[in-house]
Amino acid sequence: MRMAAQYEMLTQLAKAGTKLDFGQDLFVKFYQAFIASNRWQQYLKGVIPTLYVTAIALTIGVVLGSVVALVRVAHDQQRRGHHDPALAVANAVCKLYATVIRGTPMMVQMLIMSMVIFANSRNFTMVGALALGINSGAYVSEIIRGGLMAVDPGQMEAGRSLGLNYITTMALIVIPQAIRSVLPALGNEFIVLLKDTSLITVIGGKELLYAA
């Protein structure tokens, strides 16, 4: 009630021609944007879709990024003289994906997804989440790849010398050690995704900026 009374007083002063100072003017604008007519409820309606889109995009990014990272690491760690043609092709595709996605603007990718690939879809929020997830996957792949490559190569050699195959050694020895160095960077990626959700407003998706 005190805020409402103060707002009414300041608006009356402004209408009378009194120049408000910076703090008073800021208070009036804040009240109009968030408090008047319970507008904060509208913002709250935008927060839930924003978190929903972020969660979906991060899930897609982590899954896609993990696959790309594992393929590239497996290719780089092949023994000399043992080159798998299928793995070489998969590595080339993964490298092309990471290079193209990281080298093109997020906005362009969003527009291509909504106006070309899913031109007939009207679920703009999900299309935006998918575009964000594919974009995130390229960055997550480099994060995970860096974490895996940072583990001492002797760990892989030790596992193989004990009779474990490549997959078991990666799952039980290498990956658990890489997680510690990967988690902080993944936290940063989550923050970036949370901010990038504002881009889906361009294609008609609903989130916090759309609600605002």
For each feature predicted by the language model, list its residue ranges:
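Transmembrane alpha-helices and adjacent helix-loop boundaries
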Residues: R2-A212
